Regions:
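Glycine-rich ThDP/TPP pyrophosphate-binding loop and its adjacent helix/strand module
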Residues: 1-177
Length: 180
């Protein structure tokens, strides 16, 4: 992309646990050295499956991991869709302008288990913590924001849900019947 003079930017996503893998460091270092137009987006829900972040890294933030590669790192409230959009938009513009990559750490929360194969989050997270994060649910926050701006209502939501019900059922059926 950079070599061709395009303003395209590569996006890569990983979780907090992924930042402790060698491939992650190699990718950030390579991109930093060659000023590759790339965004490294890290979804930090505080756990690598069930291992707390404090038990997997000494870094105070995951955004700091970019510093050694000469890459700017920024932390954003991953539960705020508008904040994530703004930070991503600015980082994309930075990378597209030839300034090199950016690492974005989104502070977020995983409500359910990491996998469906026996991961029980109640073993490592408290009910109080879950309830606290529920108050910051991005869907509820966006609904409230749009409602306050007069752009959304319960009637609009109900109509949309009714409109897409069959489409969602069809997608689920296709996924259930998909050969892997």
């Amino acid at each position: 992309m950079k070599k061709n003079g395009s303003d395209e930017v590569a996006f890569t996503y990983t979780g907090d646990g992924g930042t402790s893998q060698g491939d992650f460091y190699e990718g950030v270092n390579f991109a930093g050295h060659f000023k590759a137009p790339a965004l490294f987006i890290v979804q930090d829900n505080g756990f690598a499956i069930s291992v707390p972040r404090a038990s997997q890294t000494a870094a105070k933030t995951l955004a700091q991991k970019a510093v050694a590669a000469g890459v700017p790192g920024v932390q954003v409230d991953g539960m705020d869709a508008l904040a994530v959009y703004e930070v991503t938009k600015e980082a994309r513009a930075w990378a597209a302008a030839g300034n090199g990559p950016v690492l974005i750490e989104t502070l977020t929360y995983r409500y359910g288990p990491h996998t469906l194969s026996g991961d029980d989050p109640t073993r490592y997270r408290s009910k109080e913590t879950d309830e606290l994060w529920q108050k910051r649910d991005p869907l509820i926050r966006m609904r409230n924001y749009l409602t306050d701006k007069g752009l959304w209502s319960k009637d609009k939501e109900d109509a949309l849900i009714e409109k897409v019900k069959d489409e969602i059922k069809d997608a689920i059926n296709k996924a259930d019947n998909c050969l892997l």
